[in-house]
Amino acid sequence: MVGIFDSGKGGAFALAELRKLRPDADAVFFADRKNAPYGTKSQETLVALAERDIGILRSFGADDILIACCTASTVYPLLSREHRRGVIPIIDATARAAVRSSKNKRIGVLATELTVRSGAFETAIRNHCKDAEVSSVSVQRLVFAIENGGSTDESVEDALRSLGDIDTVILGCTHFAAIEEKIKKEGLAAVNSARIGAELLSERVKSGSGITLYINE
């Protein structure tokens, strides 16, 4: 059994990507809607929530767990050793994919307030390409729009203008899988963190019956 957690729809996007790769995976998905959004929480609160979420998924039999949330992934190094066991963050793998995708090494990051403030994507990108130019924009209102089924057009346009001259955009919140095609229509490469996470998790899947348990709070 594998597990996935997020505060909302972003985790559902990751689960959908996992199903494309491994329809036989037995999975449990926890959506912590009670504490959504994670992107505005303090670091201390986020550590507590992430460790609790991991514990919940393990209680349902999950051995390998995807943090399907870039914001929660920023505090992965702060989790206890026991809570890090078998847990997959998505910042570094997403940054690596962006560096590989970018031709001019000018990379934009669309993310939540806490993720941008942490500088996690910038650090990870430069670990893979020290000369990369990185622009980051916090688009918290875009998270709300996607979570509540609202229009994303204006937020996407404003965010892309703020990012400037780039050729690759990291969708640095798994919710932003919803705007991947809009980014591509602007002639930019879009790196989908939900898909990257699902690919990482799929490598740990043991063949099962394809059941999914949904936990909501």
What are these regions (language model features)?
Residues 1-217:
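Non-catalytic structural scaffold of enzyme domains
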